[in-house]
Amino acid sequence: MQRAFTSSRASVLSSASSTRAPLSRFRSAGVGLQQQRFAHKELKFGVEARASLLKGIDTLAKAVTTTLGPKGRNVLIESPYGSPKITKDGVTVAKAVTLQDKFENLGARLLQDVASKTNEVAGDGTTTATVLARAIFSETVKNVAAGCNPMDLRRGIQSAVEAVVEYLQTNKRDITTTEEIAQVATISANGDTHVGKLISNAMEKVGKEGVITVKDGKTIDDELEVTEGMRFDRGYVSPYFITDTKAQKVEFEKPLILLSEKKISAVQDIIPALEASTSLRRPLVIIAEDIEGEALAVCILNKLRGQLQVAAVKAPGFGDNRKSILGDIGILTNATVFTDELDLKLEKATPDMLGSTGSITITKEDTIILNGEGSKDAIAQRCEQIRSVISDPATSDYEKEKLQERLAKLSGGVAVIKVGGASEIEVGEKKDRVVDALNATRAAVEEGILPGGGTALLKAAANGLTSLNPTNFDQKLGISIIKNAITRPARTIVENSGLEGSVIVGKLTDDFAGDFNRGFDSARGEYVDMIGAGIVDPLKVVRTALVDASGVASLLGTTEVAIVEAPEEKVPAGSGAGGMGGGMGGMGGGMF
């Protein structure tokens, strides 16, 4: 028995030692694969590189441009989770595309970046930017292949873009009426007048700088909810302050407001405010960095006994931003903010230092102040101060975002558009259109409007480039590239409507070149005054699309080398079997 055990053990040891060689081969093969995977790159040069990039750009642009115009088609996109997505939003389509060939995918990704950047700045115009970038790059590639200097072509392109932007800014029209706002929103929502009216109503109620958000609704119909006043994301400190147990919220009419930048813990700090609340028979709301200890206990005790109506809320924001928001609330409610800088003590508060508002609603998560009794002039002055800081070049993007939020809360209110629909797919598609329409409307309010349907760019091609004086022939070709490229959006819109684009574009640039507003209504198939017909584009959208597209496309034209990661090479199928064969041989040797 002992002998058998020893023999068996020797056999296993023998087989283990004999398998070391094939294991080392596996390890060396793994190292080789890693070297292949991380060290190997593929390069393409010159015409071949630009041709691959152009092929990728053409593929992506073909998918995106089908959505352009009133008769543009939808795109169905597979989703890794849940239902497929149906959309007519250019940037959504662009982001969904990944190509198998890595060089082609490089071009597609650059075009995706153009669409994303345009969407980020203007909120719309991504399809127009894609059309322009494709047209500019394809013409640049042809001219570079013919022997033109790519740097001079780029200089000509950039000078032409600057001239077009200047021409558009000269001929823009400021948006003034609710009807014009509705027209802009309707066009961007693919001709949906209901969406246009919804957005114009929201903007009318909360102001042009008011906060408008878009959310998924829970019913079939679209809904608009408007909060007129200031809302911030801080709720009650203790549930003992609740006045409406069913809705779990605090509601006061005509409350007094006490504002403090510091924590309140000592009871003597709030006694003057509590006495004012009692004598005036009005509720008291304390907004401070925090309220704790004896001060909080006294407030809760008085509330539970029914001796006075009181509630406490933590101040919104952090650091300097909290200080600024408290100042905004002070202006809105005509309250004094107790701060260290003013050397004001809470125990010396007088009734005239307390603010006042029409009503206040406090939930667990947020507080809404309605109809603050602050001076209209003081509020307007505060808004102007915030605008001046926003326009300061030294202000960071993060600070601008916070300042915009403060300005919106002071100047208007908050509107929520709840998008309804019968299914998740329908709600998602409609929500994309509503967001596009909202972004386009904001852009129109900010910089003005132009005749839509690509008309403004067509007229710029006919009239906006005549004053340029290129220094050489290649720069002249660069200007010509832009002149041809900016006719492409109008041509694409017409072709998506099933008509002959070159004929209609030719008529607009030849017969109607002198009439800036005269364009072609692709939905009805008529030549009309585009502004009069309500077919408009925001200047900011058109300008951003052209600048972004020309910048990337002309830079691509100067590309001489493209480098990508080489595809991973698979391990040959026979290598694993060979290793096993060696192992089996070793086992056989051990047995004998």
Swiss-Prot record:
CDD domains: GroEL. InterPro entries: Chaperonin_Cpn60_CS, Cpn60/GroEL, Cpn60/GroEL/TCP-1, GroEL-like_apical_dom_sf, GROEL-like_equatorial_sf, TCP-1-like_intermed_sf. The keyword Mitochondrion applies. SUPFAM superfamilies: GroEL apical domain-like, GroEL equatorial domain-like, GroEL-intermediate domain like. One of its GO terms (cellular component) is mitochondrion. It comes from the Eukaryota. Gene3D superfamilies: GroEL, GroEL-like equatorial domain, TCP-1-like chaperonin intermediate domain. One of its GO terms (molecular function) is ATP binding. This is Heat shock protein 60, mitochondrial. Keywords: ATP-binding, Chaperone, Mitochondrion, Nucleotide-binding, Stress response, Transit peptide. May participate in assembly and/or disassembly of proteins imported into the mitochondrion. HSP60 are ATPases and have affinity for unfolded proteins. HAMAP family: CH60 (MF_00600). Signal peptide: none annotated. Belongs to the chaperonin (HSP60) family. One of its GO terms (biological process) is protein refolding. Pfam families: Cpn60_TCP1. It comes from Paracoccidioides lutzii (strain ATCC MYA-826 / Pb01). It is found in: Mitochondrion. The keyword Chaperone applies.
